[in-house]
Amino acid sequence: MEVEYDDSGWQGRAKGQTNPEETLEDNPQKTIQECLEKFLTPDYIMEPGIFTQLKRYFQSGGSPEEVISMLSENYKAVAQMANLLAEWLILAGVKVTEVQAMVENHLKEMILKSFDPKKADTIFTEEGETPDWLTEMIDHYTWRSLIYRLAEEYPDCLMLNFTIKLISDAGFQSEITSISTAAQQIEVFSRVLKTSIVKFLNNPDDVHGAIQECARMVCHGQHTYVYSQVLIQVLSQEQKGGFNMKRLSQEIIKYALQNNQNVTPITMALNGSAVYPQACQALTSMLTRNTLNPADITVLFRNYSGSDPPPIDLIRNPQFLELLVDALFRSGVKINPEHKPKYMFLLAYASAVIDQPAKKRPMTERMLNKEELKSTIQAIEKAHTICNVDQGSTELIAELQTLYNCIKYPVVGVGVIRWIENVVMEPSYFKLSTDSCPTHLAVLDEVAAVHPTLQQQILFLLIRLFESKQDELEILVQLEMKKMILDRMVNLLTRGCVVPVLRYIKQCCAIEDTDISLIRYFVTEVLETITHPYSPEFVQLFLPMVENEEITGTMRGEGDNDPVSEFIVHCKAHYTTV
């Protein structure tokens, strides 16, 4: 009896049809041998490429009986045994989620140990398209996190870079926190940069953190820096929100300088300073050396006091402004009296003059508003005179009214913070101070009241003081000093700097390196200061501290009439989602 052999086409093609993309193997015996070597590996029947290899094997004349025998004998059922073991664990009472995490974590460890980027790249060369299993993988965070780790270790792997792009295309770019991973592809980097900028714009309570995150990514390399700054420069020209982008650009420049990255040539190229070669050369010289010198200051003064001054943006460089503020307000810096007015003029010009396009005239023509220039120069001069004299708290009291009048100018506020920082960070400052609140710190309260935008700087200074080692002081004196600093933080909180202050105190509670009596003191002061309604974020940060028995246990009475109980009852009644 003849056996009729069904030689219909592979995967449903009719007999006699061929795929024009398929070509016959040049050496059938060699192809068969290659396929047999693969079929001999354990559990090859479970491999994604099994159908491709079977097709090659049969087209080259391979024996069906032999391949069936090989695949059967080498079937170890590792995956099936893992599934069976997982089912047993579930039957034994282990939670499904725990079993799943157990299997996934073990599999991740195995992949991390045995991953071969060259073999991974062959996935695309063999299959010619994105495998379905890869598309399914990126839907799950567990496997996306694995891809991120592998991409950091193997930045040149084409398969991983392609997968990162797939992840970004799928909308998960906010998860890509590794800069080296994002910087490999412009599309991915652009999306991650956009997400970072949006976070900066939408998180006014954590501007510093958002800026640091964005700046770290932008400063990853020259290509990321130039690309990002050009993009931000274009956005800064927009009428709506342009100033926010300009601030972001300047903060990125500051971050780069703090990390010893010389970005001055790029900055000068982007600000259009080439039209004013004298001013450009003078500023570049000082920025490159990170120090001011009278000759270059004189060149800038001559340019900006002339009839056709360069754009203000040229000297609104963060590094240059930092150098000017340091020169005029940091104790111990000596400036030649002949050149001092030039320093003051440039600082006042950069902070007080308004440069805007003239109405009904070409965009290239600018209109300068110098109404506040003279008064700003006078305020800087008066404040500089007070700050430049080495005087204690008692002598300073006589100058307070004059100083408070000068502080109304934002640039003077910045300078005064710099001066106070230089004074109070001296190790002997609190040892010599006998006041319950030193005059210098009282001046900080005034700056915080007048300039909300400087509150973050003041908080950073207070945090440094709070965490500073005051070993020369007795323990009780140290506690009183820290209570006084906490009073300054409470003052900041009442002025609107609420979330940053509470986040810091919450961090102190979490680390447990702060005396609990200080946390209790802070909570007491805040409870005496605040009243409802409260924002959900305030309750989320402050309520756990108030509920903490270790902190407020001794502050509670028998009833609900004490401030602690009243706050807790009110929050429980009105903030059920917290």
Curated annotation (Swiss-Prot):
GO cellular component, one term: polytene chromosome puff
Compartments it resides in: Nucleus; Chromosome
Main localisation: nucleus
Presence of keyword Nucleus: yes
InterPro entries: TH1 (IPR006942)
Pfam families linked to this entry: TH1 (PF04858)
Tagged with keyword Nucleus: yes
PANTHER family noted in UniProt: NEGATIVE ELONGATION FACTOR C_D, NEGATIVE ELONGATION FACTOR D
Family: Belongs to the NELF-D family.
Subunit structure, interactors included: Component of the NELF complex, which is at least composed of TH1/NELF-D and NELF-E.
Protein name as it appears in the record: Negative elongation factor D
Organism: Drosophila melanogaster (Fruit fly)
Gene that this polypeptide is encoded by: TH1
